[in-house]
């Protein structure tokens, strides 16, 4: 085994930071990546492999999630097994106590080693019913529906556009042979990572996995780059109580040097919820505008990143169907400011919010384990929280303005909406809001 470490140069005990990610390459080529934290009350360990809906086509859409759900349904004494399904990877995570992490690691290794036998002996009927119910739930929830169709419209023609859990139609036709072909292609040593987080000994866990993991050799499948397409999808439904919309531009990928810059830019506009007790004290200028004219109930800006591309924009819920166009006008005109008149105070506040959000997202061993796996699989390494904070702190106002000029100003947008969207005017009307006369 080849052992290494990207640990922090010094442990900041006051904040109880983790010791950084430690890596071990097993004799079979699989990477074990762990982050230990002496303050952790529980531990998690997971098997992750690059796949997800991006590895599928329209006829096999859902096979990644179905296969992972089957593997995660095995009995697990002393551990809680959970399936993790994303657009670019899948995982089976065992949550357990710190003292039981070695046994959980053996369990994960056993599932990986016997994945083919597990799938061959499993009747997929109930699993397909469960996955179809999950896919239907996505379409039944307005927010999930809008964002799912936003990705599908933005990356249409590419596998990145496919729903993470498939559709009821595609799932119905999946068979055991589809899962076996999926495993043969994606569950291979160069496409697999064992990730873990908690309070345990890295070397003991790596040794336990080394002794129990048998996995096929294979190369990491190549992914076809996805192009962003300015477009729109409208799913008007007047039976719903509100308008649910999302507007976005082409964002940054996980591998982009501007990954954190995009997050700071999104945080400049932030979130707003009309019925919150702190609504009147929300800082961004857009929040003041929407309260003055009472044109939106809630919105949140986001920067969603995949391995090589991303989406940057907002999701909004509007109770008054006659103010949809008002909100899109004011929100997109605020985006114009990103490359013109963003202030030092706005950037400083946004940087603080991004750092807080990052720390909050990694508040438990399950979240840290998933984050380690995602970054190692899709980027090749994972930065520590300290390194991320240093990059965020280095962002200046001019950096944000330059990013706004190149990624937001007068750029194509993608629009997705459902509910009372009669007042969501045509694409060209909103596209023209992406710039303004300057002299």
UniProtKB/Swiss-Prot annotation:
GO cellular component, one term: mitochondrial inner membrane
Pfam families according to UniProt: Peptidase_M16 (PF00675), Peptidase_M16_C (PF05193)
Induction: Expression is induced in the presence of amphotericin B. Expression is repressed by niric oxide and during spider biofilm formation. Expression is also repressed by HAP43.
Effect of a null allele: Leads to decreased vegetative growth on several carbon sources including maltose, citrate and acetate.
Top-level taxon of the source organism: Eukaryota
Subcellular location as annotated: Mitochondrion inner membrane
Entries under Gene3D superfamilies matching the protein: Metalloenzyme, LuxS/M16 peptidase-like
Gene Ontology biological process terms, A to Z: aerobic respiration; mitochondrial electron transport, ubiquinol to cytochrome c; protein processing involved in protein targeting to mitochondrion
InterPro entries: Metalloenz_LuxS/M16, MPP/UQCRC_Complex, Pept_M16_N, Peptidase_M16_C
Membrane topology field: Peripheral membrane protein
SUPFAM superfamilies per the UniProt record, alphabetical: LuxS/MPP-like metallohydrolase
Keywords: Electron transport, Membrane, Mitochondrion, Mitochondrion inner membrane, Respiratory chain, Transit peptide, Transport
Signal peptide (UniProt feature, chain positions): none
Organelle targeting peptide span: 1-17
GO molecular function: metal ion binding; metalloendopeptidase activity; ubiquinol-cytochrome-c reductase activity
UniProt family annotation: Belongs to the peptidase M16 family. UQCRC1/QCR1 subfamily.
PANTHER family in UniProt: CYTOCHROME B-C1 COMPLEX SUBUNIT 1, MITOCHONDRIAL (PTHR11851:SF126), METALLOPROTEASE (PTHR11851)
Cited function: Component of the ubiquinol-cytochrome c oxidoreductase, a multisubunit transmembrane complex that is part of the mitochondrial electron transport chain which drives oxidative phosphorylation. The complex plays an important role in the uptake of multiple carbon sources present in different host niches.
Record's subunit section: Component of the ubiquinol-cytochrome c oxidoreductase (cytochrome b-c1 complex, complex III, CIII), a multisubunit enzyme composed of 10 subunits. The complex is composed of 3 respiratory subunits cytochrome b (COB), cytochrome c1 (CYT1) and Rieske protein (RIP1), 2 core protein subunits COR1 and QCR2, and 5 low-molecular weight protein subunits QCR6, QCR7, QCR8, QCR9 and QCR10.
Name of the protein in its database record: Cytochrome b-c1 complex reductase subunit, mitochondrial
Organism: Candida albicans (strain SC5314 / ATCC MYA-2876)
């Amino acid at each position: 085994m080849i052992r290494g470490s990207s640990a922090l140069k010094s442990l900041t005990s006051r904040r109880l930071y983790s010791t950084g990610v430690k890596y071990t390459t097993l004799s079979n080529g699989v990477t074990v990546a762990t982050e230990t934290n002496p303050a952790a009350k529980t531990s998690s360990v997971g098997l992750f492999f690059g796949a997800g809906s991006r590895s599928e086509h329209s006829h096999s859409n859902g096979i990644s999630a179905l296969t992972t759900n089957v593997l995660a349904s095995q009995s697990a004494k002393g551990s809680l097994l959970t399936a993790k399904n994303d657009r670019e990877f899948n995982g089976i995570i065992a949550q357990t106590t710190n003292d039981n992490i070695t046994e959980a690691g053996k369990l994960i290794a056993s599932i990986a080693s016997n994945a083919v036998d597990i799938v061959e002996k499993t009747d997929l009927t109930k699993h397909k019913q469960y996955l179809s119910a999950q896919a239907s739930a996505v379409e039944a929830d307005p927010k999930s529906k809008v964002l799912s169709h936003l990705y599908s419209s933005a990356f249409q023609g590419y596998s990145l556009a496919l729903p993470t859990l498939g559709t009821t139609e595609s799932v119905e036709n999946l068979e055991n042979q589809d899962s076996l072909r999926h495993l043969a292609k994606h569950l291979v040593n160069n496409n697999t990572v064992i990730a873990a987080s908690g309070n345990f000994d890295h070397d003991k866990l790596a040794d336990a996995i080394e002794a129990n993991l048998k996995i096929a050799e294979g190369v990491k499948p190549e992914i076809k780059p996805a192009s962003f397409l300015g477009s729109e999808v409208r799913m008007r439904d007047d039976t719903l109580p509100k308008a649910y919309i999302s507007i976005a531009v082409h964002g940054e990928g996980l591998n982009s040097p501007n990954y954190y810059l995009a997050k700071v830019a999104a945080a400049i506009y932030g979130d707003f919820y009309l019925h919150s007790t702190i609504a009147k004290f929300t800082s961004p200028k857009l929040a003041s505008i929407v309260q003055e004219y009472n044109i939106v109930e809630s919105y949140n800006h986001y920067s969603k990143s995949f391995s090589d591309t991303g989406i940057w924009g907002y999701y909004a819920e509007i109770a008054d169907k006659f103010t949809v166009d008002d909100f899109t006008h004011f929100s997109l005109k605020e985006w114009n400011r990103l490359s013109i008149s963003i202030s030092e105070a706005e950037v400083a506040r946004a940087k603080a919010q991004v750092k807080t959000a990052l720390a909050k997202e990694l508040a438990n061993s399950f979240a840290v384990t998933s984050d380690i796996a995602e970054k190692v699989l899709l980027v090749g390494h994972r930065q520590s929280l300290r390194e991320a904070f240093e990059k965020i702190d280095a962002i200046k106002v001019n950096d944000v303005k330059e990013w706004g000029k190149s990624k937001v100003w007068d750029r194509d947008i993608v629009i997705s909406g459902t509910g009372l969207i009669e007042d969501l005017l045509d694409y060209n009307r909103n596209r023209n809001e992406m710039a303004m006369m300057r002299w």
